[in-house]
């Protein structure tokens, strides 16, 4: 992000604003962690901040601080669009192409608000007035930490904000094991722990609250695991029938793809999940 952009955003956020924060459709830990962390920070700054998620997200993320005030666009369409149309600022987090927020694309595109993108994926689109994009970052949640740092407001980060950001970083790095988990990432995590964030509490809430059905679905996924040794590639498939049989709930397949990466010799892993009601097969 350019110095002029930082200065302009500081001025923009210097007085109370109506702000909307939007994660991508089917929000994961990083999307919700970064959104809620940023929202709590902006509220401490005196802004009216609202997280509007395009649709529902996993139960294991609903303990996060600020979760009770998240608006589900899919369930509260009219309310959401009124808030979006009257917003002064819209932050889009953890995505860089507007269609990734589903049916929210049009109201966001039509809004007169200043738009700010914070994201770590490749090839960002040019819809935002200000773009903070860094493909070398492990997560958008770490970028939100650095955004707050650029605003010279690290003193605003408390345990609640820290828990949200820690969750996002942890989940998007498979518990800090992916290559983009750098020494800077660990320094950020250390700062959050020093603030009082309890890492074991977060780990338990995310990884140790499995339903019986989810573990059975994991077993099904492992049974479907294939390894193309000549291509150093593994993949998992799950059909709609298999999802239904095991009582699939949103978020149940979170992290399944990482098991494919754990195979010796695997350099690429993918999971293909059939969603007949939406007419699509998702690939992660």
PLM feature segments, named:
Residues 2-25, 33-65, 69-71, 78-81, ...:
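Hydrophobic helix-and-loop "lid/oligomerization" segment in the mid-to-C-terminal part
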Residues 22, 26, 92, 117-118, ...:
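Generic enzyme active-site microenvironment
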Residues 26-27, 95-98, 121-123, 240-241, ...:
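Short glycine-rich anion-binding loops that position phosphate/pyrophosphate groups of nucleotides
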Residues 29-35, 98-102:
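Short glycine/serine/threonine-rich phosphate/pyrophosphate-binding segments
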Residues 38-39, 107-110, 133-134, 187:
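Glycine-rich, phosphate-binding/catalytic loops in enzymes
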Residues 41, 67-69, 106-114, 150, ...:
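A glycine- and small-aliphatic-rich helix-loop capping segment at beta-alpha/alpha-beta transitions
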Residues 71-130:
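Active-site cofactor/cluster-binding pocket
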Residues 118-188:
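Short alpha-helices
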